[in-house]
Amino acid sequence: MAKDAFTDDNRTPVRIPLATEPVGILKSWQMMRENVLNIIPEQATEEPVISGKTAKRWHMVMDPGAIQQILLDRVEDYPKSTVTKNLLRPAIGESLFIAEGAHWRWQRRASAPVFSHRNVAALGPVMTAAAERTAQRVAQAGPRAVNMLDEMITATFDVIAEVTFSDDGSFDRNAVHKALETYVNDAGRVSLLDVLGMPDWIPRPGRTTASAEMAQMKQDADAAIEARAARGPGDVPDLLDLLLAGQDPKSGRSMTTSELRDNLLTFIVAGHETTALTLAWSFYLCAFDSRVQDKARAEAQKVLQGRAATTADVENLPYIRQIIDEALRLYPPAGVVSRTAQKRDTLCGADIQPDDTVMIPIYALGRHKLLWDNPDQFDPDRFQNRKSIKRYAYLPFGDGPRICIGASFAVQEAVIILATLLSRFRFTPVKGRDPKPVMVITLRPEGGVWLMAEPV
């Protein structure tokens, strides 16, 4: 692990040492179970592509042109990997995140209007209220250290629960949260059977049990969806109302109850976990570099004048946005994405065969020495001119037709919460409690982000 990084003199925040020598199948599996980032070689920050073989042939691709080939030019030839689908399907079914081909396309067309600029902006008051509640909780902690990871998980789950099912009491939010957390903890780790390429029909220990525990929660969700469909939308439509009204403009198809449920669960997972992690890392980085924090606070205080941030403020908080962008570069929630090649191809000279695993190690991509100046340094100014960032070198939300449908929602929420809290508190580190970047399904700060929060 990196040396203590909570000083302004040390300009390198925490970083996981990447692999420097090849390992066998069993060791590779053990490393992945502990931290998926462990399988990324240091070479991945220096080379355009790396190839190898464990039980199956694999390739890690870091060249932006080749990544464009995977995510845009030949996207149909690179569906999500079988391992990814096996991990997530029991929780979110054949939703937008998992589905491929025509089944994905009609769902995307039906869902896209839900996340229009108008609809996302209309949900802003929920984010503002969550930011205010979070500020009050932090203030009540007094002179004690605050785990900003826990605070951000609470804040973002409150937001996604409110904008998904509103506050009509038809759905037990805590039960949803617990079921999803249990699934990730119990079943979200790669099985040795996955690494060995064993058939899908062979049960994965832990995953079967966790899937069974999800069944009751899904039944409750179905009942809530059917009750809402019978009752109709509220004064301000939430995501469920918008999805119920949604229709594929090409086929006229609408989602069934199970399709609605799977997509809502996808939005709940993606809509709070990734934003919470981005915010937690952002607070860590602001505490790491007090100069950046002071500059951000000055911007936030000038714009907000003591109130919580709103949707209308987001465009006037460019430096806050730059901090979030830089946090996503250094600590992307999806540190590695994986695809399974369907056809022969060539990527930067690498021969790609059908059934090869093709990975984009986004964690390494954001630290690549040929793509970024001083890549391990925390420097929000590198995003001052976003047009200077090479496309496909920066992929916090993916790219191509499968780019994250909720990206604008996530950015709006993150800016509102970060600006509100920085305008009211000065965050400083707790010595000896550096977080450790660990990826199971998402890249989390293991141990939490413990900071002192002094009112200003």
Predicted regions span which residues?
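Cytochrome P450 heme-thiolate monooxygenase catalytic core
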Residues: 1-18, 79-85, 103, 119-277, ...
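Cytochrome P450 proximal C-terminal region
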Residues: 2-13, 44, 131-135, 152, ...
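N-terminal membrane-proximal hinge/A-helix region immediately C-terminal to the signal-anchor transmembrane segment
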Residues: 2-106, 121, 125-133, 155, ...
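Conserved cytochrome P450 K-helix E-x-x-R motif and the immediately C-terminal K′/meander segment
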Residues: 26-48, 219, 223, 307-348
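Cytochrome P450 fold signature focused on the C-terminal beta-domain
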Residues: 232-237, 297-317, 330-350, 359, ...
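Cytochrome P450 catalytic-core helices
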Residues: 274-293, 297-299, 408-425
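Residue-level recognition of short, solvent-exposed, well-ordered loop/turn junctions
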Residues: 353-354
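Conserved cytochrome P450 K-helix/beta-meander segment immediately N-terminal to the heme-binding cysteine loop
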Residues: 360-387
